[in-house]
Amino acid sequence: MAVQKNRKTRSKRGMRRSHDALPAAALTEDSNTGEVHRRHHISPDGMYRGRQVISQGDSDDE
């Protein structure tokens, strides 16, 4: 079984963790409505690449 001989320093631990950070999500402004949405995802109003993908039906919460 692999067991380290010496304790790793805070510096080495930090160097190892330097690649663990998640990149910020790429955001794009919609040209039609001006809303901000994630790249390659449907905008909140149901549009994707200039087309209405999901129809916005009237949602009566009863």
UniProtKB/Swiss-Prot annotation:
Which keywords belong to this entry? Answer: Ribonucleoprotein, Ribosomal protein
Q: Which InterPro entries match?
A: Ribosomal_bL32, Ribosomal_bL32_bact, Ribosomal_zn-bd
Kindly list the GO molecular function terms attached to this UniProt entry. Answer: structural constituent of ribosome
Origin superkingdom = Bacteria
Disordered as annotated region, ranges:
1-62
Regions of biased composition (Polar residues) lie at: 53-62
Q: Name one GO biological process term.
A: translation
Q: Which Pfam families match?
A: Ribosomal_L32p (PF01783)
Q: Name one GO cellular component term.
A: large ribosomal subunit
For bias type Basic residues, the affected ranges are 1-16
Family statement? Belongs to the bacterial ribosomal protein bL32 family.
Q: Which NCBIfam families match?
A: rpmF_bact
Q: What is this protein called?
A: Large ribosomal subunit protein bL32
The organism named in the record is: Alcanivorax borkumensis (strain ATCC 700651 / DSM 11573 / NCIMB 13689 / SK2)
